[in-house]
């Protein structure tokens, strides 16, 4: 049986941490002038994959 291949798009978007899978934040790339300082600060906070999606993300990363 051949080796499992990691989904390269998922590998660039998710980081596996000790207790969770870290992900990026949406709405933080462009058109930032109309967004308030508070909203942009909240978008900078770390985000983690929801528990219902952890298994599917792990399978993309060949961790399951």
Swiss-Prot record:
Coiled-coil ranges (or none): none
GO MF term set: structural constituent of ribosome
GO CC annotations on file: cytosolic large ribosomal subunit
Keyword Amino-acid biosynthesis: no
Keyword annotations: Ribonucleoprotein, Ribosomal protein
Gene Ontology biological process terms in this record: translation
UniProt cross-references to InterPro entries, sorted A to Z: Ribosomal_bL35, Ribosomal_bL35-like, Ribosomal_bL35_CS, Ribosomal_bL35_sf
Pfam families in the record: Ribosomal_L35p
Keyword Ribosomal protein: yes
Tree of life domain: Bacteria
Family classification: Belongs to the bacterial ribosomal protein bL35 family.
HAMAP family reported for this sequence: Ribosomal_bL35 (MF_00514)
NCBIfam families, per the entry: rpmI_bact (TIGR00001)
Protein name (Swiss-Prot/TrEMBL): Large ribosomal subunit protein bL35
Organism for this UniProt entry: Helicobacter hepaticus (strain ATCC 51449 / 3B1)
Lineage: Bacteria, Pseudomonadati, Campylobacterota, Epsilonproteobacteria, Campylobacterales
């Amino acid at each position: 049986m051949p080796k499992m291949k990691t989904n390269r798009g998922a590998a660039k978007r998710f980081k596996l941490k000790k207790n969770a899978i870290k992900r990026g934040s949406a709405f933080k790339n462009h058109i930032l002038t109309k967004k308030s300082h508070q909203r942009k600060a909240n978008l900078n906070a770390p985000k983690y994959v929801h528990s219902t999606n952890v298994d599917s993300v792990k399978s993309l990363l060949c961790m399951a």
